[in-house]
């Protein structure tokens, strides 16, 4: 396979470089090499490289800042995937794209399915929903992985923020009325590579099960319990912290207002992905323990 990877310096893109390398020729670019909001540069890159697979984890991910920068969010998250879809269709290429739980309002009591209609609460969620919709309309061959609460050893994320604060503070208040599944960037990359490996071996690619799939680690938690788990796992991994798990106090989201509203329910049903591709999705705590050990070794 001849692959093009965007956003190589993001937390998911970083892991994808590792996971995709064994599958074939890989060209990985960052924002400096190709600004996704520069439509002509993006088209030129795709036409020059002529990939058979385009993997696009690049996105505008500043959820709160998007409320005051909607044009920037929609350029990167809305229009860029549409352009990628148009160019992929010209080449007959497969596009792999990533979406978010923030396309939902969180009012559904059960985990969200792939068939549930988006109803975002934020500009970020609106931009991601628009980009996914446009991409799927343009590119027949697409795999969109909708995920939640992404973390990793590389880049900025909730787990690393809690780890830093645990070394600085003796008490922390964290939202306890929003539920989801923390999902490691490594899991996203590994599952992507496994499915692309199946795609590579698929006898008739016209019959490959393209589409949108929920992809998140097994289990669920609140942000507060997630933070407590980060602190407890960090102590076990050998970190010297000021904060103990019991020092993480629960609060309601209403007590910690942010510019962008978040869904109360971010749970995603993953049965179709696991059944279609024969995959096991490990518990979120496994990925967290691995990342914390990795960070401790390199600190």
Task: Outline where the language-model segments fall.
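NAD(P)-dependent short-chain dehydrogenase/reductase
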Residues: 136-194
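Amphipathic terminal alpha-helices
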Residues: 282-299
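Adenosine-cofactor binding site in Rossmann-like domains, unifying the SAM/SAH pocket
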Residues: 21-44
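NAD(P)H-binding glycine-rich loop region in Rossmannoid oxidoreductase-like domains
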Residues: 39-78
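Mid/C-terminal beta-alpha module of Rossmann-like enzyme folds, strongest
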Residues: 191, 198-257
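N-terminal Rossmann NAD(P)H-binding glycine-rich loop of SDR-like oxidoreductase domains
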Residues: 1-20
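Catalytic helix-loop patch of NAD(P)-dependent Rossmann-fold dehydrogenases
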Residues: 68, 75, 79-83, 90, ...
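Active-site loop of classical SDR/Rossmann-like NAD(P)-dependent oxidoreductases
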Residues: 249-269, 283
């Amino acid at each position: 396979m001849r692959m093009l990877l965007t956003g190589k310096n993001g937390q998911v893109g970083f892991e994808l470089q590792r996971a995709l390398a064994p599958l074939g020729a890989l060209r990985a670019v960052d924002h400096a090499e190709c600004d996704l909001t520069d439509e002509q540069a993006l088209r030129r890159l795709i036409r020059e490289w002529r990939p058979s697979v385009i993997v696009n984890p690049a996105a505008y991910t500043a959820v709160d800042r998007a409320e005051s920068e909607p044009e920037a969010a929609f350029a990167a998250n809305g229009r860029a995937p549409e352009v990628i879809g148009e160019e992929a269709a010209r080449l007959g290429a497969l596009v792999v794209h990533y979406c978010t739980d923030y396309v939902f309002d969180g009012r559904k009591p059960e985990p969200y399915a792939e068939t549930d209609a988006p109803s975002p609460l934020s500009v970020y969620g609106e931009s991601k929903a628009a980009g996914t919709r446009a991409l799927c309309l343009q590119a027949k061959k697409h795999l969109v992985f909708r995920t939640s609460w992404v973390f990793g050893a590389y880049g900025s994320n909730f787990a690393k923020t809690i780890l830093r604060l645990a070394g600085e503070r003796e008490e922390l208040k964290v939202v306890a009325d929003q539920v989801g599944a923390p999902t490691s960037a490594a899991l996203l990359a590994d599952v992507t590579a496994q499915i692309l490996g199946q795609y590579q071996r698929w006898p008739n690619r016209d019959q490959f099960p393209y589409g949108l799939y929920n992809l998140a680690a097994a289990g669920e938690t609140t942000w507060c319990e997630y933070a407590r788990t980060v602190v407890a796992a960090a102590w076990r991994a050998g970190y010297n912290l000021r904060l103990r798990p019991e020092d993480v106090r629960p609060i309601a989201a209403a007590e910690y207002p942010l510019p962008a509203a978040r869904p109360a329910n971010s749970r995603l049903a993953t049965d179709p992905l696991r059944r279609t591709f024969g995959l096991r999705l490990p518990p979120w705590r496994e990925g967290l323990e691995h990342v914390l050990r990795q960070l401790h070794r390199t600190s």
